[in-house]
């Protein structure tokens, strides 16, 4: 079988997709976008009790170094352009986790004039973590769900 036949059958690209997705799931570098009390639980998940490092999750200070944004807390109208600007500065491929009721849909402040009713109106969201505030276990579960989503994507054969 020639090399064209191998590519036509999809074996090489499928195997390469599996390797690339495996490396991406083991090296998620989130940038913290803590806006309210959910950020405390996000910090709690990064401490020694839950240890996000064992999943390959290392917090980065710059959007240019990160591939995951965790939006944690109430997003107000004034902060929405900054969220979009930081999202646009992130390198491809990039993912977003919306953490908490306020980031998911406005939460307790849903009817306030100054609150965005969900960060998915500003940036595309991959995983929603419910709760007010969500526990560190819920954030860990959301990260595991994102890793499973990344494993299912095809990066080469589109």
From Swiss-Prot:
<dbReference type="InterPro" id="IPR006138">
    <property type="entry name" value="NADH_UQ_OxRdtase_20Kd_su"/>
</dbReference>
<keyword id="KW-0479">Metal-binding</keyword>
<keyword id="KW-0830">Ubiquinone</keyword>
<dbReference type="GO" id="GO:0005886">
    <property type="term" value="C:plasma membrane"/>
</dbReference>
<feature type="binding site">
    <location>
        <position position="102"/>
    </location>
    <ligand>
        <name>[4Fe-4S] cluster</name>
    </ligand>
</feature>
<keyword id="KW-0520">NAD</keyword>
<protein>
    <recommendedName>
        <fullName>NADH-quinone oxidoreductase subunit B 1</fullName>
        <ecNumber>7.1.1.-</ecNumber>
    </recommendedName>
</protein>
<keyword id="KW-0411">Iron-sulfur</keyword>
<dbReference type="Pfam" id="PF01058">
    <property type="entry name" value="Oxidored_q6"/>
</dbReference>
<feature type="binding site">
    <location>
        <position position="132"/>
    </location>
    <ligand>
        <name>[4Fe-4S] cluster</name>
    </ligand>
</feature>
<dbReference type="GO" id="GO:0045271">
    <property type="term" value="C:respiratory chain complex I"/>
</dbReference>
<keyword id="KW-0004">4Fe-4S</keyword>
<dbReference type="GO" id="GO:0015990">
    <property type="term" value="P:electron transport coupled proton transport"/>
</dbReference>
<keyword id="KW-1278">Translocase</keyword>
<keyword id="KW-0874">Quinone</keyword>
<comment type="function">
    <text>NDH-1 shuttles electrons from NADH, via FMN and iron-sulfur (Fe-S) centers, to quinones in the respiratory chain. Couples the redox reaction to proton translocation (for every two electrons transferred, four hydrogen ions are translocated across the cytoplasmic membrane), and thus conserves the redox energy in a proton gradient.</text>
</comment>
<keyword id="KW-0813">Transport</keyword>
<dbReference type="GO" id="GO:0051539">
    <property type="term" value="F:4 iron, 4 sulfur cluster binding"/>
</dbReference>
<dbReference type="InterPro" id="IPR006137">
    <property type="entry name" value="NADH_UbQ_OxRdtase-like_20kDa"/>
</dbReference>
<dbReference type="GO" id="GO:0008137">
    <property type="term" value="F:NADH dehydrogenase (ubiquinone) activity"/>
</dbReference>
<feature type="binding site">
    <location>
        <position position="38"/>
    </location>
    <ligand>
        <name>[4Fe-4S] cluster</name>
    </ligand>
</feature>
<dbReference type="GO" id="GO:0050136">
    <property type="term" value="F:NADH:ubiquinone reductase (non-electrogenic) activity"/>
</dbReference>
<comment type="similarity">
    <text>Belongs to the complex I 20 kDa subunit family.</text>
</comment>
<dbReference type="GO" id="GO:0009060">
    <property type="term" value="P:aerobic respiration"/>
</dbReference>
<keyword id="KW-0472">Membrane</keyword>
<dbReference type="GO" id="GO:0005506">
    <property type="term" value="F:iron ion binding"/>
</dbReference>
<dbReference type="GO" id="GO:0048038">
    <property type="term" value="F:quinone binding"/>
</dbReference>
<keyword id="KW-0997">Cell inner membrane</keyword>
<keyword id="KW-1003">Cell membrane</keyword>
<comment type="subunit">
    <text>NDH-1 is composed of 14 different subunits. Subunits NuoB, C, D, E, F, and G constitute the peripheral sector of the complex.</text>
</comment>
<feature type="binding site">
    <location>
        <position position="37"/>
    </location>
    <ligand>
        <name>[4Fe-4S] cluster</name>
    </ligand>
</feature>
<keyword id="KW-0408">Iron</keyword>
